[in-house]
């Protein structure tokens, strides 16, 4: 998570039992100049010290385009004594018409000790009724998973790039989704990071004339930044899902073997270098190379299809940003059940 570059006020301190009354008073005082807007409930849970201020800054930026009721929680589960503080605030932005301020309210909690076990009750009692419930979980998942909490969540947001034990964490996500009867949409910001590069790869194979390459792909090479191996694994899973590769297995930490639809072997190799999360990808089919790489010092992708007997021709496509506000904003604009991601997760279980 990015560091706070300026101090953001948490707002007015309130007694937890008076939060709703104080919110009504806040809006009454601003009547005429402020318009309350909310399309979703967005709860943010973190166990990092100082995250309350950091996430308040993120909410200030996010609500420029995504009106919500934000419930921001910082929890210290290791504290010996109970501690609970609460604040209310509003993130206001001038409307495009320029005459009124459109405001999203935020309720903030700093919890410590045994009272952190009351997370579910605290969240539920401050949801804006009848609006979808998005939960952004910034901590590690841990057992036991609270079935009541997960049964209410409509969209679970997390970043698998931060997981120390991906297999164990994914198993707990499976438990949470089961508690929600499969209704909960999984929103992995690590998957969102791949949006632009997946689009760049997909356009190579849009023309029917390129489909004969599907069963001829022999090797894939992916370059990723330190700490982003899991992002590369998701990219492998996407290729496997779209191209119907099966029998995935890891040959060490950097080499993977899969089987294509024609029962031929496909070898995937990872390499690590400083730079973007996914710095480059090369797919080889016979004498043809399909390549995508980040342009140095810009937010563009260099996209190339090169045949051995032809001159190399480069194109450019947008690369997107590896910025938490941009990633979350992209995620909130999405709809649907993220069915492709669900298939990808099934493909990579043997690779992570």
Segments the model singles out, each with a brief description of its role:
Residues 53-56, 119-120, 144-147, 229-235:
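A short acidic (Asp/Glu
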Residues 1-8, 12, 18-34, 38-41, ...:
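C-terminal structured domains
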Residues 84-97, 154-163, 176-182, 269-276:
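Acidic, Ser/Thr-rich peripheral helices and adjacent loops at domain boundaries
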Residues 61-72, 127-133, 151-156, 177-182, ...:
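Structural alpha-beta junctions
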Residues 190-252:
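ATP/pyrophosphate-binding catalytic subdomain of soluble kinases
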Residues 69-78, 135-139, 160-163, 185, ...:
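A generic structural motif
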Residues 1-136:
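An N-terminal, globular interaction/scaffold subdomain
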Residues 108-109, 113-211:
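Conserved, well-structured core segments that form the ligand-binding/active-site neighborhood
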């Amino acid at each position: 998570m990015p560091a706070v570059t300026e101090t953001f006020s948490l707002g007015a301190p309130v007694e937890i039992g008076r939060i709703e009354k104080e919110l009504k008073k806040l809006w009454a005082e601003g009547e005429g100049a402020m318009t309350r807007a909310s399309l979703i409930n967005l709860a943010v849970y973190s166990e990092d010290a100082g995250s309350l201020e950091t996430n308040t800054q993120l909410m200030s930026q996010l609500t420029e385009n995504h009106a919500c009721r934000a419930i921001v929680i910082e929890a210290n589960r290791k504290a010996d004594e109970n501690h609970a503080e609460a604040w209310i605030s509003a993130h206001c932005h001038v409307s495009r018409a320029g005459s009124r301020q459109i405001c999203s309210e935020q309720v903030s909690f700093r919890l410590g000790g045994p009272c952190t076990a009351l997370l579910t009750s605290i969240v539920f009692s401050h949801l804006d009724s009848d609006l979808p419930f998005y939960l952004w979980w910034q901590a590690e998942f841990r057992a036991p998973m609270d079935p009541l909490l997960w049964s209410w969540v409509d969209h679970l947001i997390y970043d698998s790039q931060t997981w120390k034990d991906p297999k164990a964490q994914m198993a707990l996500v499976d438990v949470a989704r089961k508690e929600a009867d499969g209704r909960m949409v999984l929103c992995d910001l690590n998957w969102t990071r791949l949006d632009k590069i997946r689009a760049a790869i997909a356009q190579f194979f849009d023309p029917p004339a390129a489909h004969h390459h599907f069963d001829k792909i022999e090797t894939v090479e992916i370059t990723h930044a330190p700490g982003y191996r899991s992002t590369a694994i998701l990219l492998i899973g996407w290729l496997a899902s779209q191209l119907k590769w099966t029998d995935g297995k890891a040959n060490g930490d950097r080499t993977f073997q899969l089987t294509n639809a024609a029962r031929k072997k496909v070898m995937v190799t990872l390499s690590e270098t400083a730079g973007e999360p996914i710095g480059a990808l090369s797919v080889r089919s016979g004498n043809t190379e399909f390549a995508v790489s980040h342009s140095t010092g810009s937010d563009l992708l260099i996209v190339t299809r090169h045949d051995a007997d032809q001159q190399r021709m480069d194109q450019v496509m947008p690369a997107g940003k590896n910025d938490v506000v941009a990633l979350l904003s992209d995620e909130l604009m999405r709809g649907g059940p993220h069915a492709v991601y669900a298939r990808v997760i099934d493909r990579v279980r043997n690779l992570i």
